[in-house]
Structures are given as C-alpha cells and as structure tokens.
C-alpha cells in the first residue's frame, strides 16, 4: 500500500537537486545509530514524497519514512552590521530494517 505519488511521476533532474547535503553532527549520528535514520539538508520547497524518491534513486535503498523539520536562521552580528543565517529544512530519512546507507569513509 503506497501512499502519495509514485517514483516514476517525479522529474529525475529535480530529484537530483532535492538533497542539498548530508548533515553530520553529534545529534544526527546518535539518531542514525538508534533508529537507522539519515539526516539531510534539503531544498526549502521539497516535499516528503520528493525526498523519499530522491534517496531511493540516488542511494538505492528502501525508505520507511521521512520526517521534516524547518529551522529558522539565527540573527548574527558582525560588529555593527546585523546579518542573518539562512533558514534550513532538514529531513530525517528512516530506512527499512536491513538497509544501510554509508555517507562517508570511516575515520581510523
């Protein structure tokens, strides 16, 4: 029982741009070990269905689910001038049992 659009309904060029970068942090690593989930920075207008299709297309793994978090950019000061960091949309992609996704080489 599949919900939402099928993998074939998406433009492959768009799917290649949906995933901006993997997020490798202490929190993301803990989540990956505990719940077999991988964290990505994604486009602001990316949908859960697009993210799922992009991960399946690029990494050839089966995705169980996708959770998305929008993080507002912080206001930062540089001397007298005020700047602002970009808003970030994070996707926590949970993989099906038995699936594994290695984003980088293991440090020795």
From Swiss-Prot:
Keywords: Ribonucleoprotein, Ribosomal protein, RNA-binding, rRNA-binding. Disulfide bonds: none annotated. The keyword Magnesium does not apply. SUPFAM superfamilies: Ribosomal proteins S24e, L23 and L15e. Gene3D superfamilies: 3.30.70.330. One of its GO terms (biological process) is translation. The keyword rRNA-binding applies. GO terms for cellular component: ribonucleoprotein complex; ribosome. One of its GO terms (molecular function) is structural constituent of ribosome. InterPro entries: Nucleotide-bd_a/b_plait_sf (IPR012677), Ribosomal_uL23-like (IPR013025), Ribosomal_uL23/eL15/eS24_sf (IPR012678). One of the early assembly proteins it binds 23S rRNA. One of the proteins that surrounds the polypeptide exit tunnel on the outside of the ribosome. Forms the main docking site for trigger factor binding to the ribosome. Belongs to the universal ribosomal protein uL23 family. PANTHER family: 60S RIBOSOMAL PROTEIN L23A. Part of the 50S ribosomal subunit. Contacts protein L29, and trigger factor when it is bound to the ribosome. This is Large ribosomal subunit protein uL23. It comes from Albidiferax ferrireducens (strain ATCC BAA-621 / DSM 15236 / T118).
């Amino acid at each position: 029982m599949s919900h939402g659009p099928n993998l074939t309904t998406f433009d492959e060029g768009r799917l290649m741009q949906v995933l901006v970068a993997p997020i490798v942090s202490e929190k993301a690593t803990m989540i990956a070990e505990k719940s077999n989930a991988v964290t990505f920075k994604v486009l602001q207008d990316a949908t859960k269905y697009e993210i799922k299709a992009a991960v399946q297309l690029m990494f050839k793994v089966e995705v169980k689910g996708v959770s998305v978090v929008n993080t507002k950019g912080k206001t930062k000061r540089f001397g007298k001038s005020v700047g602002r960091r970009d808003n970030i949309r994070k996707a926590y992609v949970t993989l099906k049992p038995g699936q594994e996704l290695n984003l980088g080489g293991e440090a020795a």
